[in-house]
Amino acid sequence: MNRQESAPRALFTPRQGQYLAFIHAYTLVNGRAPAHADIQRFFRLTPPTVHQMLLTLEKAGLISRQPGQPRSLVVLVEHGELPRLDPPDFNQSNSL
């Protein structure tokens, strides 16, 4: 078995899945993508943590966004592949 035939790799970590599910759900409910402040409030994260998380998701090809344009986040993962959005557990680390 060569590398291309190996077992499928998870598209994202459980934590990343929660961020993606939040962006997707927020967009459905509000008709627009969340602002960084919305993500900060929901997950109780600092601005630098949200920024780094979005960069990581973008590098992984899981979201797209237009730099300098607010609320331009688009989830590139099919809705059926996203996990259920759980309430954040503030007793655990919020890192990627």
Enumerate the predicted regions with their spans:
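Short, Lys/Arg-enriched N-terminal segment that forms or immediately precedes the first helix
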Residues: 1-11
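A short alpha-helical element within helix-turn-helix/winged-helix DNA-binding domains
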Residues: 33-43
